[in-house]
Amino acid sequence: MEEFQGYLELDRYQQHDFLYPLIFREYIYALAHDHGLNRSILLDNVGYDNKSSLLIIKRLISRMYKHNHFFISANASNQKKKLGYNKNLYSQKISEGFTVIVEISFSLRLVSSLEATETVKSYNLRSIHSIFPFLEDKFPHLNYVSDVLIPYPIHLEILVQTLRYWVKDASSLHLLRLFLHEYYNWNSLITSNNFFFSKSNPRLFLLLYNSHVCEYEFILLFLRNQSSHLQLTSSGIFFERIHFYEKIKYPVEKVFANDFPASILWFFKDPFMHYVRYQGKSILASKDTPLLMNKWKYYLVNLWQCHSYVWSQPGRIYINKLSKHSLDFLGYFSSIRPNLSVVRSQMLENSFITDNAMKKLDTLVPIIPLIGSLAKVKFCNALGHPISKSTWADSSDFDIIDRFLRICRNLSHYYSGSSRKKSLYRIKYILRLSCLKTLARKHKSTVRTFLKRLGSKLLEEFFTEEEQILSLVFPRASYTFTFKKLYRGRIWYLDIFCINDLINYE
């Protein structure tokens, strides 16, 4: 990101908090287009989009300079036909450019803050799989967990107001309001169907949503850090938001001593509170009693309602015992199960056999939702029976096989942390047979006849992906033993940065 700083002229514009002129730079849209090509896609590679050509970008910038011809009402369809351009396409490109500008600005601030605090940058922590080693280490020692769905703000203006704390340029914010008002139904309420999973410009909405969640999590993290570094910690400040900023001016110990007697302060001590989030779903876990979890629940609800102006019902946030509850998170079903082991001890002439029960995080492949995702994209029916992919029948044999192998490879890559691999074998079987049926349909033959002509090479390709990956990780000398041992275990990769729709079935 450092090389972009001089190229994008961000230093000169950030001195005056003025990012609006960068929208007229062609390389901003080139960066937005390059970001779209480099995304990790499971189902298909994104080809070159003719609508993103440099000619269209130049035409877009020239129309922006002629602002009296560009910004027209959404109902003026006759004017749009006379001008001869697609207004929705141009608005999408400008919003993509705006998103790139704000993202780079955020990234530069993050880099400067890391350098100021001398924090070591660890790019491996960006991986989604980096969450699971944390869960494996912490969750077996915790008792209670709560699945929390972060509510959406009721109006788009709330998101603009949140972004105002990060972007000081009023012109850019007015431009953002114009796009949201003209093209995204400004007056409608926000739901998960029409906002977060919007197909028109998901990158812009992800930026707005993440800035909204980032602000609320910043307050949550601040209060959590304050409570963890104090010997006496109470939740009194959580319920008195009006007086909170007043109270922090005075000694915290004095405030806590005045608010709560010493006999009940132990209820609020909790060094084992853990918070994990991905997209709009978060997990709150604790080793303490349900009383403290309940207090944190009401604190979150009050924080959402009073600070973020979103409505949430406390009764819909359930506190579950971790040993009896399964978490649906990041495409895995995770639960805590006892891991029994027998230890034989020899002491002189006496021997003892001891049963040890240790808790272990169990991660499973959600087979039913995953089959539903495969059925949605026409790889199988609702019962899991493979069908041919008719839309790919016009492609070459190499492209068809390569597409199926890519999906199978990425699924194996993502679900390499599963405790049991039998469910993953069924998914591979569906993809393999769907590939054969697609090829047989293209050549107007049966699966049996086509398989005899093709041989067993295709079958081997679908089941040797793990061996190929492990052979790159471990040396040949120890590969045979290592593969037999680790293939049954879990492997977490640190290069997975996003979840595709095939896995993100929620």
From Swiss-Prot:
Alphabetical UniProt keywords: Chloroplast, mRNA processing, Plastid, RNA-binding, tRNA processing
Recorded family membership: Belongs to the intron maturase 2 family. MatK subfamily.
InterPro entries the UniProt entry points to: Domain_X, Maturase_MatK, Maturase_MatK_N
Protein name per Swiss-Prot or TrEMBL: Maturase K
GO terms assigned for molecular function: RNA binding
Location(s) in or outside the cell: Plastid, Chloroplast
Coiled-coil ranges from the UniProt annotation: none
Biological processes annotated in GO: mRNA processing; RNA splicing; tRNA processing
Gene source species: Prunus persica
